[in-house]
Amino acid sequence: MLNDQKIEKFRQIVENKFQIYNSLFMSLPYDKMTNIGMLLPFLYEESKEGYQLGKSPEEIVEDFFQKHTELETEDQKTELLFKIIQYIERQVVLFDSIEDAAFQQLHSESDSGTVMNLYDRATQEHHLAAIRKKMDDFAIKIVFTAHPTQFYPNAVQRIIHDLRDAIINDSVTQIDTLLQQLGKTPFVNKERPTPLDEAMSIIYYLRYVYYQSIGELYRKIKQVYGTSNFTPSPDIIQLGFWPGGDRDGNPFVTADITLKVAEELRISILKDYYGHLKNVRRRLSFRGVSDVLEKLSKKLYASIFQKDVKISAQEIIDQLDEAEKILLEQHNGLFRDVLDDYRDRVKIFGTHFATLDIRQDSRVHQKVVDDIFVKVSGLAVDSKSNDEKINYLLESNAVLNPDDFEDEMTCETLKSIYNIKLIQENNGERGMHRYIISNSDEVKDVMNVYVMMKLCGYSEDEINIDIVPLFETMEGLDKSEEVMRTLYSDEVYKKHLAKRNNKQIIMLGFSDGTKDGGYLKANWQIYTSKEKLTKISEENGMKVVFFDGRGGPPARGGGKTHDFYASQGNTIANNQIELTIQGQTITSVFGNKDQAKFNFEQLLTAGIENDVFKSIKKDLNDKERQLISELADISYKKYSDLKAHPMFVPYLQEMSTLEYYGRTNIGSRPSKRGAGSELKFEDLRAIPFVGSWSQLKQNVPGFFGFGFALRTLKDQGRFDEIKELYKGSDFFKTLVLNSMMSMNKTYFPLTYYMRNNEKFGEFWNVLFSEFELSKAMMLELTDYKILMQEEPINRKSIKIREKIVLPLLSIQQYALIKLQKNEGDRDTYEKLVMRSLFGNINASRNSA
């Protein structure tokens, strides 16, 4: 579909439908709903015109009260603001649902990045054999995390699901009823969710979205690429899972919770198999076949509801093979495809559904190993160096009992290691086989985990676990090559890797990397680190797999994911694409079957075409490398100066929503590391950090320093070099376009009032100047007239969303100003700030 046709289609099936169904809100039979619907456009106009005139949010909201209401008391005014927030929250849900419902009509099976498009291109260029060869040794893995950017409670998620279907069918009556339900359903968790609640929220998507979307996508891959000699591996699409296993900074994730989540994953996939088998049996009603399937059905049922009954994936497959044998011999293979599809699901999802990972901070491990050393050796903790402690414990024959340790963290850490064996017995080895170490920047960080496993009674042959270092700060990335070089030459670790098929998984953190080094520097540092790690791995005969810790927005490694992976050069290992997906990105990018299938496809084809279709735009030459490196260093210096500004943390603390993230009850994890009352930059978690800039509509981490770097080289008369780089490098182009997406979601007029602030005025002007510079430089570089010029539909979608939430932003800033001035009821204004967080985050779809 051509761009103009797509834009017109979007106008008809998204914009127009939103206008029509939005009017249904006005007729909902709830308290003052019509009144709110009539007042809201006035608040929007006051905001739009007011900001253009340089008014503050306080002036805008007060003008609105004065001109359009007769409210007098503070209580009456804040009550109206709460009702407006509730109304806008539901408008956002409606727009989400309409846009999601239009997905299939706006995308076709032959779009760029689809399986069919890849097939057509491979056929034309005679690369089909190469594609099949690559498929044999390639996979994508999407790892769902529990990071708190997901603001819809489960009840609302289900309404969204039903609303989307009703919109697809244009069922006005059902839409009206669902909007009524939406009006009465709370959007806010009264209590902070437990890690188990978070896990159940994502398991909902596994059961009702990914079981179908991945199953259907694999069937399509088989149909398109399969031959009598080649069947694509069912492992080509894999799922990972962090809720209940990610302990980093979350004291509520206990060893017991991990066991419960693993069991929920096992039971959930068996429920899907049980339900799916009912449909299979409706077709395969033949003598002999039906008996085998009935027996399987009973065993599945018992495995779901009886604790002492277990069924393995192989057992299910064996029974399906038996049914197939009878089907072929006695019933002409009728409906064999139905049986085949079912068996493929079992091969894909096993009895684990998604692989549960454990993650913990290296500093926690060090304390645990110190504790163990003292207990086992009887020596003082500082009597040996860290390396000496590791060597001592490797020689020890001790088998630890977690209950022998008084320290709760030591006890919990050891229990979680013992539980790995149990989870592998119940869910299969794929149920849990990775231990991720946050903040890895030393060899000991990896060896500490190996030592703990050995002391928990695992023999060398039983350590069926990939130990995964996570390099996430500038310092960690700098050291990563040396760390891996040492590990690859360590006899103990080398032996362990041999048992793991000489495969090393390395995780790289885009979120903390960008927070630490700024957008351009972090992305370039990760790129060059991957190159060095690829080289050192190949030299040591190791197959390296990179696991990218990416968030929703460009400031946390998100943005155009397909373009990012398709732009990786041949100097970076491409054995597998693994990345984290979280919060809003789960609902907005993988939230329904069509979207999920499309986006799984995009990732899969990005990795395959990157290897098969060589392009000079992917590999950087020495001149291009030097140029990106210069730009990255200049931008890093600029960003570092900003971080060192005495007003940096106070600005976030006093002028943004940072302080309120932890109070929103959207995630189980605290919003900052450490328990101290004074906020330090290093204690800030990446999500609240990036999210707070997003709420201010400033998105600083997504562009700051980039424009300054471009201008610096332009002043040296080298802008033509950068233009050549932009045209010649897919990687650099993707970075520029992602940064422009961040800038397109900014709205500095919202905070113009801060420019005259006695304390923060100068700091605000630093931010604004760099935004103006970055925007001007990038438009000049790309020859665009407007940001995101090449993506008219995404730009249109963002514009509508920004229009919906503009009144919400005014309310949030109004409440923040009242709090800064210490005016009115503090508790009420704090609640206004928190409530407005939800709608703003949900509307932007990838803000944190």
Regions found by a protein language model. Name each.
Residues T227-S228, R287, D291, R336-L339, ...:
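Short, glycine/acidic-rich hinge or "gate" loops at secondary-structure transitions
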Residues E15, V172, M200, Y204, ...:
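Conserved structured core elements
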Residues M1-E79, K83, D100-T123, T185, ...:
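Acidic, glycine-enriched catalytic cores built around paired aspartates
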Residues L2-P234, D256-I311, L356-R359, W764, ...:
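Extended, highly charged
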